[in-house]
Amino acid sequence: MPKATLVSPPFVDAHFHLDATLSLGTPRLNRSGTLIEGIALWGELKPLLTHEAVLERALRYCDLAVSQGLLAIRSHVDICDDRLLAVEALLEVKRKVAPYLHLELVAFPQDGYFRSPTAATNLERALDRGVEVVGGIPHFERTMADGAASVRALCEIAAARGLRVDLHCDETDDPLSRHIETLVCEAQRLGLNGRVAGSHLTSMHSMDNYYVSKLLPLMAEAGVAAIPNPLINIVLQGRHDTYPKRRGMTRVPELRGAGIPVAFGQDCCMDPWYSLGSADMLDVAHMALHVGQLTSREAMRFCYDAITVNPARIMGLEHYGLDVGCHADLVVLQAKDPIEAIRLRATRLFVVRRGEVIAETPERVAALSIEGRPPKVDPAAYAPRES
């Protein structure tokens, strides 16, 4: 065992798309790198999906996730397929991985709740079959008015069923895309406080500062959480810019300063939208730290919380953490502390679920053959004295 180790609660990903994961190149690659081409590609892929293929890819991804210490995932699943093929496949995945990974599913109308003719019916069917969170994509509706109406309808469904809400909200560079304010209003109106999240919120990056100063207190009052997806936001946003080119990720320091719960999601891994990814939430935090300029020691520790305790709270995970009485779920990392874990994207030495080691990785130590220098290099040994 290395001298520098950190015992951490497991990583939690509050925003992912398990139905599309590991499908890179099928039926073709995203040449433009844009969100819109990614959605079009997914539309081409959907008719080709089989239950077995979705199941196999999702289970392979869960294997990778566990090896990285990622033991809880909230995955959106597209319901704009009348077969509900991906829904059925991921419900089976949920049952299969339950002994070692918590999987929560969001009914996601990828093609628009109103824009897709059967989305409303399919969403209810998915919820009836056991999908437990209501999703949406208001900025993809045909008009701003339809987008706002979809937010109201989806929140009413969640309130009637006693479910949580997690909408893809304002994933655009358009500063006038303000569906988050409708989401906040509906959370207050329907008593959904603490059960609602807005994912992405990239338009906030471009909004007028005065408007944001009004919006943030309303989000805090309604208990609406924010789930940026740093790896994807920095890649997909700003595609219509020349220079200067916007970073796209929402205003994380300001959200945090307003007392709004913030968690970072990975969103994609080797799929129509993103050709990279490795199920490594430390990679997500590392990108968020850079894009959001979250470089104070306190802010870097917050970035670690945004991939552990914060998403666990947003998802309502019970018995999560290292306190007495919690599940014995933990990760042992080859790092001195959370900041070093992010800096190094530290090796996950042991992953423990309910007290049993379910994954382990040898410590990362390089052997040197340089005269007069030490024979081995442990990257974790380079930590500053105070971090």
Where does each model-flagged region fall?
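Histidine/acidic residue-rich metal-binding segments in metalloenzymes
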Residues: 85-99, 116-225, 241-264, 320
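Active-site microenvironment of metallo-dependent hydrolases
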Residues: 301-387
